[in-house]
Amino acid sequence: MNVFSQTQRYKALFWLSLFHLLVITSSNYLVQLPVSILGFHTTWGAFSFPFIFLATDLTVRIFGAPLARRIIFAVMIPALLISYVISSLFYMGSWQGFGALAHFNLFVARIATASFMAYALGQILDVHVFNRLRQSRRWWLAPTASTLFGNVSDTLAFFFIAFWRSPDAFMAEHWMEIALVDYCFKVLISIVFFLPMYGVLLNMLLKRLADKSEINALQAS
């Protein structure tokens, strides 16, 4: 783990928290939109949410687990509120107008609450697993294991809280199937696309940080 100034850590906390909020908000909207792939039911949220695990794993690798946990706790409440507002305004993928905020939407509230709980469980487990394995010589072991375990708790918690006995008949009937397919797609997407991306971004960021450290050292001398 590199040594960073307090200013660098505050900047990382701000921008990474903003990124987490963006992914959570978009995923909570996209999870309302079912899609069928090769006869299996899933949602578009399966394709956006893995970005969270990529960002978290890079944060733990470069900045350490404490900053990653600070990001998780900083994001939880704002994500809950923003997710409810966005999902209410664009309920079932259609613009509802600002008048939709005047009425409590139980379906959207369940999605926002489920996202709150699932995000906390999934990310805390992801940080814990990754932090335990990040010293391994196999660079791919920590992100792979943390993705597998983090996504299990995240997916099960989210779909159970959001869609068990949901007012949406389709989601209430198919939530277990969708959760299983969603998990499989998340893992597949993460391993095929995000794991190589993790390796590339890690090397790029470490090189950039090393170059900046050398420049700062030269300027100081």
From Swiss-Prot:
The chain crosses the membrane at residues 13-33, 35-55, 71-91, 98-118, 144-164, 185-205. Belongs to the vitamin uptake transporter (VUT/ECF) (TC 2.A.88) family. Q precursor transporter subfamily. Involved in the import of queuosine (Q) precursors, required for Q precursor salvage. Transports 7-cyano-7-deazaguanine (preQ(0)) and 7-aminomethyl-7-deazaguanine (preQ(1)), with a preference for preQ(0). Residues 1-12, 56-70, 119-143, 206-221 are cytoplasmic. Disruption phenotype: YhhQ-queD double mutant cannot produce Q modified tRNA in minimal media with preQ(0) or preQ(1). YhhQ expressed from a plasmid restores the presence of Q modified tRNA. It comes from the Bacteria. This is Queuosine precursor transporter. Its main location: membrane. It is found in: Cell inner membrane. GO terms for biological process: pyrimidine-containing compound transmembrane transport; queuosine salvage. It is a multi-pass membrane protein. It comes from Escherichia coli (strain K12).
